[in-house]
Structure formats: C-alpha cells, structure tokens
C-alpha cells in the first residue's frame, strides 16, 4: 500500500503534467473544439491535449487504484441502482449542452476554412475516452482516496480546486466548473461510484460538442472539394 506522501506525490506529479499539456495547448490556440471550428487552432494540438490527459491521468489512476486497494464498486457501473433523479440530471445536462452550443459563433459560409474528414468521428471517440479517464481520476481516485484519508468536506474542496484550475484557462468556464464539480462530486459520493459523474459529464460535453460539429458540417463538406 502506498504511503500518504507517495500517493499525493503521484497525484500532484501527473496532475501537473496534464496541467502543463493544457497550458501548452491553450498557448498554441488549440485547446478546445471551438478553436478548431473558428480557425484559431489545429486539430493536432487538440488531440495532443486529449491524448496527454488519457495517458497521464490514466497512468496515475491505474497506479493508485491498484496500490491503494480502492473498492472495485467505485469503478463499476450499477445501472439498476441509478434513480430517476440521476436520469433527470443527465437529461438536463443534454439540454443545457445543446442550448449552450447554439449560442456559439461559427465561421461565415464563405470561409475557406475546412476540417479533415476524419475529424468528427475521431474527435468524439477520443473525447469520450478522455472524459471517462478524466472522471476516473478526479471523481474516482482523487475523490475517494481523499475521503478515506481526509474526510468528505476536505476531499470535495480539494477536488474542486484541482478541477477548477484545469478550467482556469477559459474565463467562461472558471466559475461554471465549480458548480459542475460540486454536482459530479455529490453524484459520485451518493452512489459510491464514478459512473454517475461520467454519465453526467459525457451528456453535457458531448451534446455540446456534437451540436457544434453539426452546425459546422459545411466545414467537413468543404474538405471534399
């Protein structure tokens, strides 16, 4: 079993590497999907950020979950136990994600900007894997290890600080990420599983991003010409 120093040292080490990857992506102007759609970034930079998150956070999650003997129920979905309130939250997340995407500004129709044919499907697949690993790290390993060591209140507070710091580079997400973080932590604690947080996060993020891509389908068509 890992000591406290080793456990939190690993968490901070891999978290810092991921934070550095995010900062680099934002500095290069390609940290988010909207940067690609508005001609401010390159797909490669966005994929680099996502893959870095999968690698760094995934490696940390695998190492700590194995050495700290976290109960398998934390990482196992229990579909029959999920109550109506959770499905209502998921539905609300989809609606909010879709509505927020409808307010985004897109390139003009006469823009010469185009996206590679592989981009939509590959982005959705990589993004889905990223969000699952992301929640395994934040609402799985970090949250439940800290609850065991430090108690619920401290664990949630630290989780929110780490989570909000990831979103600090986008001033539109800074404060919303705190609210989202509270919801995701509470859902995970209530069900003693990371999967409710995964479902809520996937529902909000993917509905938003898929709608953005659909609204920009003309960019995909241009790549045929």
Residue spans for each PLM region:
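Residue-identity detector for glutamine
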Residues: 32, 83-85, 192
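Small-residue packing motifs within transmembrane alpha-helices
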Residues: 5, 12, 17, 49, ...
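N-terminal, membrane-interfacial amphipathic/helix-forming hydrophobic leader that caps
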Residues: 1-76, 154, 209-225
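Juxtamembrane helix-loop-helix connectors linking adjacent transmembrane helices
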Residues: 37-45, 64-130, 136, 144-149, ...
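Transmembrane helix-loop-helix hairpins at the membrane interface
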Residues: 20, 107, 116-225
């Amino acid at each position: 079993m890992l000591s406290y120093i080793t456990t939190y040292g690993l968490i901070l080490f891999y978290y810092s590497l991921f934070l550095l990857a995010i900062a680099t992506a934002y500095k290069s102007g390609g940290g988010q999907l909207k940067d690609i759609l508005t001609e401010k970034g390159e797909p490669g930079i966005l994929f680099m950020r996502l893959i870095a998150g999968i690698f760094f956070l995934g490696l940390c999650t695998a190492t700590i979950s194995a050495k700290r003997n976290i109960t398998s129920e934390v990482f196992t979905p229990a579909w029959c136990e999920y109550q109506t309130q959770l499905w209502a939250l998921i539905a609300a997340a989809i609606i909010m994600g879709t509505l927020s995407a409808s307010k985004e500004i897109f390139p003009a129709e006469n823009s010469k900007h185009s996206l590679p044919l592989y981009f939509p499907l590959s982005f959705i697949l990589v993004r889905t894997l990223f969000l699952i690993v992301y929640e395994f790290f934040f609402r799985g390993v970090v949250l439940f290890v800290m609850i065991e060591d430090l108690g619920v209140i401290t664990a949630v507070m630290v989780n929110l600080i780490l989570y909000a710091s990831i979103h600090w580079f986008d001033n539109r997400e800074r404060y919303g990420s705190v609210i989202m973080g509270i919801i995701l932590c509470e859902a995970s604690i209530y069900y003693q599983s990371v999967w409710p947080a995964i479902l809520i996060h996937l529902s909000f993020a993917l509905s938003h991003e898929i709608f953005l891509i659909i609204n920009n389908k003309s960019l995909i068509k241009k790549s045929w010409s």
